[in-house]
UniProtKB/Swiss-Prot annotation:
Domain of life: Bacteria
Name of this chain's protein: DNA-directed RNA polymerase subunit beta'
Record field: catalytic activity: RNA(n) + a ribonucleoside 5'-triphosphate = RNA(n+1) + diphosphate
Any one annotated GO CC term: DNA-directed RNA polymerase complex
Record-stated family: Belongs to the RNA polymerase beta' chain family.
Annotated source species: Micrococcus luteus (strain ATCC 4698 / DSM 20030 / JCM 1464 / CCM 169 / CCUG 5858 / IAM 1056 / NBRC 3333 / NCIMB 9278 / NCTC 2665 / VKM Ac-2230)
């Protein structure tokens, strides 16, 4: 299948005003939307047909041109182009702004890109943009320098004149005062009058002095400010700025608002700035260097791309197509509209008002205010609520801006691009279908008819049951009888996909061959329930139909349920008989020596079955039976004198003979009693030894026999079955005494409350265990509850203990254990107080489940995101590196046995180097597949450790290689090229996360049940590379430890071997120290009990150790919960966490200091530099949490659709990033085939052509149909039936015009 629409890169950049105008089909000038009388869009408004295209297909607005024949004509009356109405989904308009505005993403984002570029604090930038301060945009340094002496002289002259004027005015007042006083003296005035005259004169003089001094000060201020004025200075004092402009306006320019920013950007010299910053980075220290690094990133982004910084200030605003911001009429004649229309309307209104004010020549203050309002309107259109209070609609709801359309789960990325609705799908309740084969599902007839409708219609026409598609459609809609036969034929061998939400791993969607069933419920095979985590208490499932031949082939070959018997997480079987089937098979293989027919001899199996039917032989009675086709096994060796092909006389039960008949003919004889464990091993063994077809057939046999004998066994549960013969009171009495003694000691004050609690808990735990053991022993072997639990069919001993023995200790709402046990069992009944204590745990269990399910789902999402581009890209990267893995360890008797974790560490890998025996012989060559057989041989030969290939050491530049990944756990074969191993890893780690979380709930909150609280949060802490709480220190160097214990504190002192300064580690008093005083410790030793910080491990021991540490820690959590996950899945994620390097010194490479770069790019740049004899860069490994690593990916599409959408897009657009489209998400977003599986080029370039034979056999019997009756269709035929006539039978000889 070829893909012609392939393109290699997707670039994002800053749109300039020219770009916006070029995209636009016209300017939106009016804020109107539609005419409420005619319901037609207003001209030049937000829905204008002239700009955005016609609202009806092939019809202009005024109705002059209608029909497709006028295609492409532009109507001269209304100006609308005659075309399809769907162009209203992609035609944009624009608003021509009367004043420039800044793009809020670049000014208000964190960090402020505009602020970094112009070296302005965001606060200052805000002042300029929102008209609170002036910004100097240019200074004519030359002219100022030239005229400075003259200006200085002029200033001096002016100040002198002012001072002289002041002095002369004061002198005049003083002279007048003298005259007045002389006059008063002569008139013989009183002293009071003289004082009054003097005071008045003093006041006048003070006023003159104050006024003159203020003017002088202002002049001095203006002069000083002007003398030192430089570009980018801010002036918040309007009066001062105006005075300076009036006096020295010809030497500088300044302005407010986005205009000022725009002018600065137009004259900004990026080259010079970059040089200056690089110099600062080389010479600077601390804060200055850090800021310079951050600024250099922004400056460099514009230097290395075609982006112009002027794109951060807009002269025109794009108007998105009207179909993406629709307006719909509601029932009551009212209209519902998208919030964007309101936001656009505010922008247009303010813009038009500003234009009018400018035309009128309004005062500057009014114009500036309108410009500020326009800036705010555009801000809220782009990102409402980013600055100040958000614009709200009715009911104080913030309006959804363009940014909000992209963000979050309901945003464009996650809602529409990554999660689309699917055609050809249905949904219904599921019921069990025990009669189905493993690869089948039951599809309700009506649903199948709707799903396969087009296929059925085509086939009806092919078979001449209908003359054309229209009549075929009518037949289908009326459920004519022939339709069902055609449907039956069409669905043969056409697989359908079944999916159950939540789809936690890939087994949540599987393909089945549909079988038509009556009713309306889907029927599901019992063995696939565990893969889907489905039960039949009302669960629903969705059906999807693969349409193209390629899709059908993939569904059949890769997704068919009989091909998905193994779990991708650990390679263990997932389709294992459960519940009823286990009980049935367990009943079949039980041995009861004292039953009828024990010790009898039967020559053949048939004879034994006849005796069983006649009641002479019990199913479980041991007898000697002659078995045909016997295959000896370790447990049941061949009888003496027996040779292959003969009937073997075996001491067994009829049940076991019947059980062995279910297995493949050449399978060794099984003599064990069937339990959940033995059946699991059996299925694993079958999957390993036999082709999938045989395994699937055997599983179906086991299922059928299990249900049959389960019914036959008559296992039921009644309250009378809860009869355990043991003396509970006697056991409890002893422990009651112990508890009382502890309580008395506490009452006397001999022990503290903590000790009392822990001792009581200890006592009651022992009591509970003893009661449980006694109860278990007291249950009769054939007791149905005992059989259910011991066979693994349902329940566990913990539940039985609570029903028949003792409920035990429970936890309180805080999660602490209450030291008073619930002594009753459910069989005896709880007292009121006991019931009350028990409710806490049960409620907490339910609440926890809900919370943790959400957390676990979020963890899976982050894991998928970080690893989605890890795909097997090549067969072999050629590396010789690998990991050393322990495969054997001595047991208690000193014998060498396989290591308990060998299944999850060494199994399914590839050897990195030869394994040699003690005598030097090569036991296994490098490149060999490590399977169960090889591990067994190596352990037998005494090998304890092997070196295997690992994803962690893979050298593929993109993704990983098949050899380093090893076997695919789900198929048991080497991973294919194109396998999306990253996503499989994420699912394998995330899916049990949810299961663990959901398990708290079944135990009803019993204290001994391991709550996952250590589980999930610990996993998140590790994958997010967070520093744990109460972090345990590790030794940074090798040396000797001394413990210094003073009254106030405890310190560990480490004296390094190399004689350097000793290092002190303060520790808490209650901490458990893991090293002894005076002990010599190697580097990286953990000194105190607790959690180690992975970042410290990386710093001290390097990346390899950090990788191992993370893998081991994650595995510890899962193993403590009894969940098996293969190491390779964790390794895939950990590799992604350590992919990046921070550049410290850039050397002579094109890397920037402080830049986070991919390891492959770093190595390539250094190799190139060394090859040319230049200085290579130096860097340090960076451990990133999965969220941070996802956001740091090369793909901006993937990062934007993950989290922090606006921040990612802002940064990507500024850097003009190109998305290489290597991952899965980016390709889903742009609608290309994903580059995994058959979507890889090596497969898509393959062309598939059916052979002639295949074409002929497409439908086995073209006319294999009975004749159907259509009563009363054509009475003139003289009969009541009408037959479809094959086209070949028509006489084509005559001319139809005759």
């Amino acid at each position: 299948m070829s893909t012609d629409n392939s393109f290699g890169l997707m670039r994002i950049g800053l749109a300039t005003a020219e770009d916006i105008r070029r995209w636009s089909y016209g300017e939106v000038k009016k804020p109107e939307t539609i005419n409420y009388r005619t319901l037609k869009p207003e001209k030049d408004g937000l829905f204008c047909e002239k700009i955005f295209g016609p609202t009806r297909d092939w019809e202009c607005a005024c109705g002059k041109y209608k029909r497709v024949r006028f295609k492409g004509i532009i109507c001269e009356r209304c100006g609308v182009e005659v075309t399809r109405s769907k162009v209203r989904r992609d035609r944009m308009g624009h608003i021509e702004l009367a004043a420039p505005v800044t793009h809020i993403w670049y000014f208000k984002g964190v960090p402020s890109r505009l602020g970094y570029l112009l070296d302005l604090a965001p606060k200052d930038l805000e002042k300029v943009i929102y008209f609170a301060a002036y910004m100097i945009t240019s200074v004519d340094e030359e002219a100022r320098h030239r005229d400075l002496a003259n200006l200085q002289a002029e200033y001096d002259q002016e100040t002198r004149v002012l001072a002289d004027q002041r002095d002369s005015d004061i002198a005049a007042v003083a002279a007048d005062l003298e005259k007045d006083l002389a006059k008063l003296e002569s008139e013989g005035a009183k002293a009071a009058e003289k004082k009054k005259a003097r005071d008045a004169a003093d006041k006048t003089m003070a006023q003159i002095r104050k006024r003159a001094d203020a003017e002088l000060d202002r002049k001095e201020q203006v002069w000083d400010r002007f003398k030192n004025l430089k570009v980018a200075d801010l002036e918040g004092d309007e009066g001062l700025y105006r005075a300076m402009r009036d006096k020295y306006g010809q030497y500088f320019e300044g302005s407010m608002g986005a205009e000022a920013i725009q002018r600065r950007l137009q004259t900004f010299d990026l080259e010079a700035e970059s040089e200056m910053l690089r110099e600062t980075i080389k010479t600077g220290k601390g804060q200055r260097k850090t800021r310079a690094l951050k600024r250099l990133k922004v400056v460099n982004a514009f230097l290395t791309t075609d982006n112009s910084p002027e794109g951060m200030v807009l002269d025109a605003v794009p108007v998105i197509p009207p179909e993406l911001r629709p307006m719909v009429q509601l029932d009551g004649g009212r209209f519902a509209t998208s919030d964007l229309n309101d936001l656009y309307r505010r922008v247009i209104n303010r813009n038009n008002r500003l234009k009018r004010l400018l035309d009128l020549g309004a005062p500057e203050i009014i114009v500036n205010n309108e410009k500020r309002m326009l800036q705010e309107a555009v801000d809220s259109l782009f990102d409402n609520g980013r600055r100040g209070r958000p614009v709200t609609g009715p009911g104080n709801r913030p309006l959804k801006s363009l940014s909000d359309m992209l963000k979050g789960k309901q945003g464009r990325f996650r809602q529409n691009l990554l999660g689309k609705r699917v055609d050809y799908s249905g949904r219904s309740v599921i019921v069990v279908g025990p009669q189905l084969k493993l690869h089948q599902c039951g599809l309700p007839k009506q649903m199948a008819l709707e799903l396969f409708k087009p296929f059925v219609m085509k086939r009806l026409v092919d078979l001449n049951h209908a003359q054309n598609i229209k009549s075929a459609k009518r037949m289908v809609e009326r459920f004519r009888p022939q339709v069902w036969d055609v449907l039956e034929e069409v669905i043969t061998e056409h697989p359908v996909l079944l999916n159950r939400a939540p789809t936690l791993h890939r087994l949540g969607i599987q393909a089945f061959e549909p079988q038509l069933v009556e009713g309306k419920a889907l029927q599901l095979h019992p063995l696939v329930c565990s893969a889907f985590n489905a039960d039949f208490d009302g669960d629903q499932m969705a059906v999807h139909l693969p349409l193209s031949p390629e899709a059908q082939a993939e569904a059949r070959l890769l997704m068919l349920s009989s091909h998905n018997i193994l779990k991708p997480s650990d390679g263990r079987a997932v389709a294992v008989p459960a519940q009823d089937m286990i009980i049935g098979l367990n009943h079949l293989t039980t041995v009861r020596p004292d039953e009828v027919g024990a010790g009898n001899l039967y020559a053949t199996v048939g004879e034994a079955i006849m005796a069983f039917d006649g009641g002479d032989l019990h199913l479980n009675a041991p007898a000697r039976i002659g078995v045909e086709g016997f295959v000896p096994s370790a447990a049941v060796p061949a009888p003496e004198g027996w040779s292959e092909g003969e009937i073997a006389l075996i001491e067994t039960t009829l049940g076991k003979v019947l059980f062995n008949e279910l297995l493949p003919d050449d399978y060794p004889w099984l003599d064990k009693q069937a339990t959940k464990g033995t059946l699991g091993q059996l299925v694993n063994d079958l999957a390993e030894r036999y082709p999938m077809v045989v395994t699937a057939q055997t599983l179906d046999n086991l299922k059928d026999a299990g249900f049959h004998w389960g019914t036959w066994s008559g296992v039921t549960v009644a309250i009378s079955d809860i009869t355990s013969d043991f003396d509970k009171a006697a056991i409890m009495e002893g422990y009651e005494e112990q508890a009382q003694r502890v309580q008395q000691q506490y009452d006397k004050g001999l022990i503290a409350d903590d000790e009392r609690r822990s001792e009581l808990i200890d006592i009651w735990n022992k009591a509970t265990d003893e009661v449980a053991a006694a109860m278990k022993d007291g249950l009769p072997e054939l007791n149905t509850i005992n059989r259910m639990v011991s066979s693994g069919a349902r329940g566990n001993w913990l539940q039985v203990r609570q029903i028949a023995g003792i409920r035990g200790l429970v936890a309180n709402p805080k999660g602490e254990i209450i030291p008073r046990p619930i002594k009753s069992s459910y069989r005896e009944g709880l007292s009121v107080l006991e019931y009350f204590s028990a409710t806490h745990g049960a409620r907490k269990g339910l609440a926890d489940t809900a919370l943790k399910t959400a957390n676990s789902g979020y963890l899976t999402r982050r894991l998928v995101d970080v690893s989605q581009d890890v795909i097997v890209r090549e067969d072999d990267c050629g590396t010789e590196r690998g990991l050393s893995v322990t495969i054997a360890a001595p047991n208690a008797d000193g014998e060498l046995v396989a290591h308990e974790q060998v299944e999850n560490s060494a199994f399914a890998r590839t050897l990195a180097q030869d394994v040699t025996g003690e005598d030097g012989t090569v036991l296994a060559a490098a490149g060999a597949d490590v399977g169960d057989v090889l591990i067994g041989e190596l352990v037998a030969a005494g090998v304890t450790e092997i070196k295997v290939r690992s994803v962690l050491t893979c050298e593929s530049a993109v993704g990983t290689c098949a050899k380093c990944y090893g076997r695919s756990m789900a198929t048991g074969q080497l991973a294919d090229i194109g396998e999306a191993v990253g996503i499989i890893a994420a699912q394998s780690i995330g899916e049990p996360g949810t299961q663990l979380t959901m398990r708290t709930f079944h135990t009803g909150g019993v204290a001994s049940a391991d709550d996952i609280t250590q589980g999930l949060p610990r996993i998140q802490e590790l994958f997010e590379a967070r520093t744990p709480k109460g972090v345990a220190p590790i030794s940074e160097v090798a040396g000797r430890v001394t413990i210094e214990d003073t009254e106030t504190s405890v310190r560990l002192l480490l004296t390094p071997d190399d004689g350097s300064e000793e290092i002190a580690y303060p520790v808490l008093r209650r901490a458990r120290i893991l090293v002894a005083d005076g002990e010599h410790v190697p580097v990286g030793t953990q000194l105190v009990a607790g959690a180690v910080d992975p970042k410290q491990v990386l710093r001290v021991l390097g990346p390899r150790a950090a990788q191992r540490f993370l893998v081991d820690e994650v595995q510890n959590v899962y193993q403590s919960q009894g969940v098996g996950i293969h190491d390779k899945h964790v390794e895939v994620i950990v590799r992604q966490m350590l992919r990046r390097i921070t550049v410290i010194e850039s050397g002579d490479t094109d890397l920037l200091p402080g830049e986070l770069t991919d390891r492959a790019r770093f190595v390539a740049a250094n190799r190139a530099a060394v090859a040319e004899g230049r200085q290579p860069a130096s860097g340090r490994d960076e451990l990133m949490g999965i969220t941070k690593a996802s956001l740091a990916t090369d793909s901006w599409l993937s990062a934007a659709s993950f989290q922090e959408t606006t921040r990612v897009l802002t940064q990507a657009a500024m850097e003009g990033k190109s998305d290489p489209l290597l991952g899965l998400k980016e390709n889903v977003i742009i609608g290309k085939l994903i580059p995994a599986g058959t979507g890889l080029d090596r497969y898509t370039k393959t062309v598939v052509e059916p052979t002639e034979e295949a074409k002929a056999n497409l439908f086995a019997s073209p006319a294999g149909f009975a004749d159907f009756d259509y009563p009363g269709l054509d009475q003139s035929l003289g009969e009541n039936d009408f037959h479809a006539v094959s086209l070949d039978d028509y006489d084509r000889g005559g001319d139809f015009r005759a």
